Each structure stands twice: as structure tokens, then as C-alpha cells.
Amino acid sequence: MARLNVNPTRMELSRLKKQLTTATRGHKLLKDKQDELMRRFIALVKENNELRIQVEQEVTDALSNFVLANATLNEAFIEELVAIPAEKVELEIIEQNILSVPVPKMIFDYDESVQEAPLDYGYVNSNSELDQAFAKISSILPKLLALANVEKTCQLLSKEIEKTRRRVNALEYMTIPQLEETIYYIQMKLEENERGEITRLIKIKSMNKEN
């Protein structure tokens, strides 16, 4: 590791020692942050996998019901039915922080009665498969939202982990070793100069005695 290009003076030595203290403290804080980010990221990945399995299974079940309903009901009736929803759904996105990482949190707001009757239609032209399909699709919405929240948070935490890792490595393998080597070099130079000065004074003293 190449040392820094500085003058070997006591003032420079003092300045570099302060820099080393700051860099060492910063490295510890960043390493702690990296470890905590990884812990939360792993927990979120596990949650994401569990949610995805649930959502995919429920979507598959809902689509199966819908396919069966579509096979026995009038196609025009189904198209008209799904053209206009029975209830307006509102989505609010707010920002929250996880270890100084801004992540979006989506809030899903709708009438709870929508889950019981997501679409307004009579039962004369319907069948049980259609009822089950719409009920399942409506019940999936909160889980889809939760899945979107978790996946976006995982994505942002992953980027922050990589950025923090680069900073930790830069301090650990470049900045701190450079400072340590430069400090060692200055200390050796100062000791060398001090020994040279002592030798010079001894010679002067010996010459004065001879005279």
C-alpha cells in the first residue's frame, strides 16, 4: 500500500492520527450498519418468498375458478361485469426510513364490504365459480400490496448494502492502511532526525571539549 505524499512533520503526524481515529470510528459505524442492513434484508427476503408463494397459489386458484365460470357463463355478461368496479380503491404512498434508507410504504384504502361483494351483480346470471373467483381476487389485493412493499424495500436495501459495502472496503483496505503506513513512515523519519540531531550535538560537545 502506497503511503500518502506528506511532509514528515510532527504537525502532520498529529493531523494524520486524528484522521485515522475518525476513519476507524467511521469504519465501525458503517460495518455495524452493513450488518444490520443484512439482517433486515435476509428477514425481508424470507417474508417476500413466503408472501409470493401465498399470492401465486391464491391467484392460481382464483384464475381456475374464473376459467370455469367463463366456460359456463355468457362472455358478454362477464365483460360487462368487470368493465366497471363496484368500489373505488385508493392507494397512498408514504415514505419511511430504515437505517437512513428512504423506502416507500403503500397504504391500501377501500371499503371492507368490497371483499364481500367486489362487483355488483345479480345471482341469476352467475354461478359459484364466478362468486369464488371474484371473492378470491378481492382478498388477494392486500397481500399483493404487501408483496409489492416488501419487494421494493428489498430492492432499495440491496442497493444500500452494496453502497455501504464499498465504503467499508474502501476504509478497511485503502484509507486506514494508507494512514497507518504514512504515520509509521513519519514516526520513523522523526526518530531518524532525532537520532541525527543527538549525534550532531554529541560531536559538537566532543569538539568543544577537545578545544
From Swiss-Prot:
Q: Which InterPro entries match?
A: V_ATPase_D
Q: Name one GO biological process term.
A: proton motive force-driven plasma membrane ATP synthesis
For this UniProt record, give its keywords in alphabetical order, as a comma-separated list. ATP synthesis, Hydrogen ion transport, Ion transport, Transport
Q: Which Pfam families match?
A: ATP-synt_D (PF01813)
Keyword check for ATP-binding: no
GO MF term list = ATP binding; proton-transporting ATP synthase activity, rotational mechanism; proton-transporting ATPase activity, rotational mechanism
Q: Which family does it belong to?
A: Belongs to the V-ATPase D subunit family.
| Role | Produces ATP from ADP in the presence of a proton gradient across the membrane.
Q: Which PANTHER family match?
A: V-TYPE ATP SYNTHASE SUBUNIT D (PTHR11671)
Name of the protein this chain belongs to: V-type ATP synthase subunit D
